[in-house]
Amino acid sequence: MKVVNLKQAILQAWKERWSDYQWAINMKKFFPKGATWDILNLAEALLEQAMIGPSPNPLILSYLKYAISSQMVSYSSVLTAISKFDDFSRDLCVQALLDIMDMFCDRLSCHGKAEECIGLCRALLSALHWLLRCTAASAERLQEGLEAGSAVTGEKQLALCLQCLEKTLSSTKNRALLHIAKLEEASSWTAIEHCLLKLGEILANLSNPQLRSQAEHCGTLIRSIPTMLSVHSEQLHKTGFPTIHALILLEGTMNLTGEMQPLVEQLMMVKRMQHIPTPLFVLEIWKACFVGLIESPEGTQELKWTAFTYLKIPQVLVKLKKYFHGDKDFTEDVNCAFEFLLKLTPLLDKADQRCNCDCTNFLLQECNKQGLLSEASFASLVSKRTADRDPQLKSSENANIQPNPGLILRAEPTVTNILKTMDADHSKSPEGLLGVLGHMLSGKSLDLLLAAAAATGKLKSFARKFINLNEFTTHGSGESTKTASVRALLFDISFLMLCHVAQTYGSEVILSESSSGEEVPFFETWMQTCMPEEGKILNPDHPCFRPDSTKVESLVALLNNSSEMKLVQMKWHEACLSISAAILEILNAWENGVLAFESIQKITDNIKGKVCSLAVCAVAWLVAHVRMLGLDEREKSLQMIRQLAGPLYSENTLQFYNERVVIMNSILEHMCADVLQQTATQIKFPSTGVDTMPYWNLLPPKRPIKEVLTDIFAKVLEKGWVDSRSIHILDTLLHMGGVYWFCNNLIKELLKETRKEHTLRAVQLLYSIFCLDMQQVTLVLLGHILPGLLTDSSKWHSLMDPPGTALAKLAVWCALSSYSSHKGQASSRQKKRHREDIEDYISLFPVEDMQPSKLMRLLSSNEDDASILSSPTDRSMNSSLSASQLHTVNMRDPLNRVLANLFLLISSVLGSRTAGPHTQFVQWFMEECVDCLEQDSRGSILQFMPFTTVSELVKVSAMSSPKVVLAITDLSLPLGRQVAAKAIAAL
């Protein structure tokens, strides 16, 4: 039907003076069913006829108002029609249009299709642009009127415009619709921003303060539309944040060599999720560092903590600085954190007493050097600490003992110098290089240098240089006795250092990412196949322990007949590989009575008399051999280990022997620890006065590990923070019981908790404990434990508040952390996932879209959930279609599969006819997702949520807010915007 007929109908009504309801009845008679009034452009036609003269036609306007009230026309068609009027000089027409907008601008709605809802968003954007243009025109007229002395009309119209603007923008729902429209039509939004700037310039000269403040308020509301989702309130009432504390302790204790970026991202993630103010965030990092310094065991661990605090954490803060806007603000926050820290005098005094120095002063100097503090702040903080410091500490400081912080800070440049020295050609000045390495072995120099290298990310480079040196010394040709002894020493020192690094910092530091064509260096080969490590079982009959028999025979003869080991032309790597078979020959001879104990003593002296590496290789094989022997067969092998670890009975003739023996004994003690515990044997290693393995064998004997787990968690919860020892016990339990056992039992403990403040603390602590292996724990928690709780009605009671809220919070935190980091590198402390685990997830959540997963078959027992199992051939709005599918996320990844299936389960729970604690749990889960989100949900875990879930969620009263809808939908996708517009327009 043509518009001309519509126009004729309107004119006929006007001529015959029909009342509004009479007009509506006749209109429905004139126009048959089928075409809607919006398609016929009724609103536009009525406005066109009403606005022909200098003043609006009241009768035709009454028809339009009736059409709006009776929903003959949609709000979007009326707004679009209004925004086409641009003769702002006709005051009465403008006022009439503002009156019409005033009727409905704060109660817009649309219950039609998604396209119609998007149409409403666009129409509202056009109407906002029209209102701004109208306001600007009114303000200009007011200024002209002021100059001419007749300002009353202009002021009245401007007041009406601002009133309508304020009423439209005060509605959160309208701002949410405008947020969607802005993403749909970026050019229109740019026009609005230009209009806003122009309006600001005009209104700046306005004398009426009330109108000016009203205009400023409207401007603020418009400018807030693009950032609607980024406003979070920070927790200003809290002072302790155990998650940050535990994360720092975990990194400092177990992951000194880890890269900084993953730690920085994890800290920022926790800061965002828990809304921690920056000064308190930095303060918590410092507090954890000082606690670590105080409680770290003496020796290597103490040096590791010192390096972590003084070298790594300042660098971490430098990286964190980039996440904050404005350097000045961040330095003020760091200064504020130190101001708070200085009030914790007992903590700082205890650290000073432990480290034999003013720890805070060293830290302030380092932060000042890194540009984290201004000079004025630095001077002020130093003077405050000096004034507050316990005077007895200064007098009790031992001038003969150099404090660790000072030593570590001096060790850092030394590491760089050593790396440069190691780059030189080894063949030119081996004696000079030996001198450098000899100094490294004295006292605690080696551990200091390694800690400094680990904290600054140079340890891998350090190890690589020593592997190259070790490789260089394996062969000697045409050498003198002196050259041969230097070569032997360089081989020995590099070998011992590399073993020490592998045991202290993990073997992954040593391993290179060598390409398939390259030859693997000797030390790497030996370490991977022959070196005992915790949890690594070696086969004593492995081919690596069975080299060429002629080499073995000559080595046995050399050990048995010579008074001492020969050095010239000695191929040390071959000797190291042959020693295991030689030891087996010697053991057999001893057991069969061919050799006496005195001969064994002479042989063991020969083995360790010149080159300690041979003793290390011998014990490595003996440890593997002892495991395979019966109780009554072990004595001789253990006796031989004792001999190799004991003092030398003959004279040693090579340099740095005592220093090398100290490292050798530490290596042997680490190697033998597991087997000695399993065989209930004791071997006394020469003591250095320091516990070389402070965190080994912490589990109490003869107690079930579940008891140990619940006990340690109860203690940690009571205390409110995790200490280093507890971290190591929990790590041992995780590897002993497995991820499912560990996670399941800790979640059971959380669900037992009924005190609200305790559940929140438990969540913060559990999250940090789960960081021991966050990826694996998240897969278990979201893929097994939560589905089990949500699908079993007998367990629903455990999801009541407060433990249910706490579990929802924990699940979201784990999901967000794992998802944000799983594309990056896994932390070096996290064990690599086995292939079969991945297969488990594939079978639980199959790859093929057409094949419903085990989990979804389980859910489809609900009679009203069959739609979930429909095959996604209809891609327009299938019940399981989510943003992740439109972004083509890799669904072979176990975490992506688990998230997708969890959100399908959530959708199923919301759509089910049975409500209960599980429904409430889903609501808390979604609320936490919204609370933790960044500006938009693209790339977050919510992209796995089916689009259909949005309409189910808004039925839950707590979730029926426009901001929530914006937060949970992926607005970067047209389909996401349609879903959001439909849900918001229906609110």
Curated annotation (Swiss-Prot):
The keyword Ligase does not apply. GO terms for cellular component: core mediator complex; mediator complex; nucleus; ubiquitin ligase complex. A motif (LXXLL motif 3) lies at residues 446-450. Keywords: Activator, Nucleus, Phosphoprotein, Repeat, Transcription, Transcription regulation. The modification Phosphoserine is found at residues 860, 871. A motif (LXXLL motif 2) lies at residues 344-348. Disulfide bonds: none annotated. It comes from the Eukaryota. Its main location: nucleus. One of its GO terms (molecular function) is transcription coactivator activity. Pfam families: Med24_N (PF11277). Component of the Mediator complex, a coactivator involved in the regulated transcription of nearly all RNA polymerase II-dependent genes. Mediator functions as a bridge to convey information from gene-specific regulatory proteins to the basal RNA polymerase II transcription machinery. Mediator is recruited to promoters by direct interactions with regulatory proteins and serves as a scaffold for the assembly of a functional preinitiation complex with RNA polymerase II and the general transcription factors. Component of the Mediator complex, which is composed of MED1, MED4, MED6, MED7, MED8, MED9, MED10, MED11, MED12, MED13, MED13L, MED14, MED15, MED16, MED17, MED18, MED19, MED20, MED21, MED22, MED23, MED24, MED25, MED26, MED27, MED29, MED30, MED31, CCNC, CDK8 and CDC2L6/CDK11. The MED12, MED13, CCNC and CDK8 subunits form a distinct module termed the CDK8 module. Mediator containing the CDK8 module is less active than Mediator lacking this module in supporting transcriptional activation. This is Mediator of RNA polymerase II transcription subunit 24.
